[in-house]
C-alpha cells in the first residue's frame, strides 16, 4: 500500500517516514528473490519475492516491475496459478506475464 507505482509512494507533500517495522520470521522461514534484466544494474523487466514461514503460517508472494504498484498475494494457495490470474488483470502483455511467472517460479524454487 505504500508503493503506488514506479518511483511513486503514498507520502503526501511534507510527510516523512519515521519508522519501518519488519516482523521477525521463525528459523523455519525460507525466502527467494529473482530479478529478470538484460545486464547487471538495469531496472527489472520482471521480479518476484517469496516468503514462506510455516511456523508463523505465512506464505507471501510479491511481484514487482509491473508498471504499477507491486502485486502482493498472501495465503496457502499462493503460487503460479494464483499469480497468473492476478497478472491477467495487470495490463501486461503475454510476454511480460510469462517473464513474471518465470521469475516467480525461480523465486519459489529458492524458497523451497
Locate the predicted segments by residue.
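C-terminal structural segment of proteins
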Residues: 1-112
